[in-house]
């Protein structure tokens, strides 16, 4: 009797588990500074969803006009830590109207996709919208640039430095030449 009930239990659990909606993108926009319209927020949530699905990471767009930390990096890092926890996959784009700065914070696998150079490139492109006061365009650019870098993959020669311990972790990416050599060695 128990052997027949166990598969039924798992079938019911699986059925209801798959029926629950994914709401990761639902909490992705925190517009405390009220820079975006409700329609713009909904559109950004839709644009964020494919990025979150591909990277298995949370993506956040946060606006504030009351930075209690006095530093955009500290504000963004604490926000991310409170939302997802330490070393979980996430990226955050902060528009800080209090300090008049923008910042991108990464955690988990997003550190590998969004290197410092890629973040700088993204922030340069975001500044076009920011300088015109078009915060929606700036947020869209952030999502589009992040998605483009994710599509390119983790760059070769990438490494991480743990800010607490100073430990360096290098990541090896197999080049096309190495793939050909490995394939030739396998068939030869």
Enumerate the predicted regions with their spans:
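Sec-dependent N-terminal signal peptides of Gram-positive bacterial secreted proteins and lipoproteins
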Residues: 2-24
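Intrinsic disorder/low-complexity segments
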Residues: 20, 26, 183-185
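Selective detector of the "anchor" transmembrane alpha-helix that sits immediately C-terminal
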Residues: 177-188
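Folded, non-transmembrane soluble domains that reside on the lumenal/extracytoplasmic side of membranes
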Residues: 23-179
